[in-house]
Amino acid sequence: MAKRSMIEREKKRIKLHQKYESKRQALLEEYNSTSDFNLKLEIHSKIQRLPRNSSKIRIRNRCWKTGRPRGYYRDFGVSRHVLREMAHQCLLPGVTKSSW
């Protein structure tokens, strides 16, 4: 189980990303469409003034049940440990144990 503070920090990052997503996207589109160097520097400084945690890159995928950041399966939203437990309990439709 992940520390409670890490899970809360991740939730805070998600909220910040949702809050500043449209503003950041508009600035990036303006930055990419402009060819004037001085204007690009000005836009870049505006982007840098946004909160660091409002960037999507800073968000880490975590298991919804345990908060584990590693061994995360995107399709299910859980870590490998929880995936195995849920598959054995037949809680994931269509998932079967492989044998060959």
Curated annotation (Swiss-Prot):
Disulfide topology: none
- Biological process annotations from GO: translation
Name the Gene3D superfamilies on file: 1.10.287.1480
The subcellular location is: Plastid, Chloroplast
Q: Which GO terms describe its cellular component?
A: chloroplast; small ribosomal subunit
- Molecular function GO labels: rRNA binding; structural constituent of ribosome
Name the NCBIfam families for this protein.
PRK08881.1
- Tell me the protein family, please: Belongs to the universal ribosomal protein uS14 family.
Please describe what this protein does: Binds 16S rRNA, required for the assembly of 30S particles.
This one is known as Small ribosomal subunit protein uS14c
Q: Which gene encodes it?
A: rps14
